[in-house]
Amino acid sequence: MSLQISPIPAHPQGECFLTAAEGRVILPASIPVDTIGRRIQVEWDPDAPVTPLGQLVFFCQFLAAGGLYSKWVAECPLRYTSPNAPKIRDVLGTWVLGCLSGAWRYAHVTALRGDKVNPQGLGMEKVVSEDSLRRAFQNEDRVALACWQKEALLRTYAPALEQPWIADLDVTVKPIYGHQEGADIGYNPHKPGRPSHAYHTVFLRTLRVALDVDVRSGKEHAAMHGLSNLWSLWDRLTPGQRPWVVCGDAGYGNERLMSECEARVQKYLFRQRSTTKVGQLVKLLEQRGGWQPLLDGWEGNEGLLQLTGWTCKRRTIVLRRKRPESAVGLEKLPLLTGQEVELVSGPVYEYVVLVTSLEENLLSLMHLYRQRADVENAYDELKNQWGWGGFTTRDLGRCQVAACMVAQVYNWWNLFVRCAEPSRAREALTSRPLLLHAVGRVIKSGGQTKLIITSNHAEAREVQDILSKLSLFLSGLTNAAEQLKSEERWRRIWHRILEPFHQQATALLGGSG
């Protein structure tokens, strides 16, 4: 007769709390937690109307006053046929909340689904799931989506184009770790051999506003691949809205772009790489002399340059400065980083060569080029603080949609911060804890809804003053001036943003902020 051996569970049950029917664990109402120095009773309240983004209500007021958000939602070409599909307003609102909270993957929006306060401020019913957000634009027409997003971006920055401004061109590389469309091996200085996407972007200088972005495969990182998007943007603008000058780094100083600028009577300022003929020009200027002292030890001279393949000679500016005695000094150069400095001739000086169609003096041209450093800061903020290049999917089309989504929310938030405190600019790393993060608790009584905000920021008093003044300004636009259309209200918001720029005629050509 065989022995009957009873199975022994691998994990002893111990003490547990079970319901009689389902056999589910019953969690205790409170848990004693022994911390350093004292015991604390912990309770959960998953249904409490609270939010960690309590000050988002002021951003919602900002969007409502400008009328941009409602029009953005109304014109969205996204269409659902299933009765169980999420609402378009919920999908777009989840995008806004996700970007503002610092998400860079679709899975990150799951952390927002318990927020029962902020979705109401954006006219939402709920925060949608990550799968709904990921699949939202999967089967939509790419042309219709591009037109919708480009028009929304244009409405955001259009009032700023009524005065002279500078368009900065740049491209950044985003490493890809999956098998996405367009993930090709191209130029990738930080991770050589790693597939990537290339983001070709046009920025509005000084205000750090992203005008447009074009996502390309990793092999299409050269400047020429972003020209079609540049001229598409340029053609959408009226003659009075077009940039005063287009600026770019060494990759943009080529015959194709410069000849197209000249055909459109568009002024430009581009840096040149070190080539044989560039070196010959520098040697010629060294022999001729006549260097003018400029700023921070830099001197300038100019001549005419025609490289092989160029159709004509062009004005070329050469800037030089004595090389530091050590590499440490080189890293501290205020004009260009060590990677951007190119030695063209001789061991004594370092040189920067610019080609331009402008007629301004050498000091003005040097100042214009130095301001390009702000574009690098904007790229750094978008990639590291806004998750630009995140929200990656297998198809390149949705990566393009995600890049424009992030750019749109980035613009709105930056302008909100500027409107709240026009005298200074803040990156998201400091502006979110200051103007967004705070515990918000909703109390409903007597038919009214009250939001009680508690901020743990050291400058909470100053923040309360800043946001209160902003709210009064926005309320004045919507209440005291009800006859104003949304476009005029948005124009007045821009007027407040540009107040710190003392010379309005040249506000966006440099200066404050």
Regions found by a protein language model. Give the residues of each.
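An anionic, glycine-rich sequence signature occurring as long contiguous blocks
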Residues: 3-4, 27-38, 42, 267-377, ...
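Short amphipathic alpha-helical "interface-anchor" segments enriched in bulky aromatics
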Residues: 62, 109, 362-405, 409-413
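Short secondary-structure boundary/capping segments
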Residues: 181-186, 260-266, 283-289
